[in-house]
Amino acid sequence: MGVTFAEAFVKSQLATDVRLPTSGKIFISVRQSDKSHAIEIARSLAELGFTLYATRGTAAAMTEAGIDVIIINKVAEGRPHIVDMIKNGEISLIINTVKNQRSAIRDSYSIRHAALQARVTYYTTLAGARAACVGIINRRELQAYNLQKLHIQLKEREIAN
């Protein structure tokens, strides 16, 4: 349980054995409509010391926003590509949203498949990625809560109102 959404989300991820990295390389590739929103997530992760990798379009948006990023090929663009990095154990986290286009869906499938086999955490929505990012930032501050005490506090509030 968490008091904030981010805290609850991180605890839910940890409880289901989803790994939230504290360092390493992160791959980000998002559809055009998500690029502006992905910038804030990328900036936060870069400030935490993560090395960011992205496909050309996402990398261009990140570079324009002043974020350091390394370009990696899509699967269809040839090797070396992101699936190679995943299989080599080089990627800690993946943020990938796709447009409804056959080649994008095919690339996304191969990335998801490699990530699943390598047990790399993978987010397909910016909401999930944002919550994970906030969780990574605040992970050191996670607390255990006594449910009985919280129940008493809620009852006291009800009585007071």
Q: Where is each model-derived feature located?
A:
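Extended, alpha-helix-rich binding/interface surfaces that flank or overlap catalytic cores
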Residues: T125
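ATP-dependent carboxylate/acyl-activation modules
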Residues: M1-T121, A129-A132, N138-N161
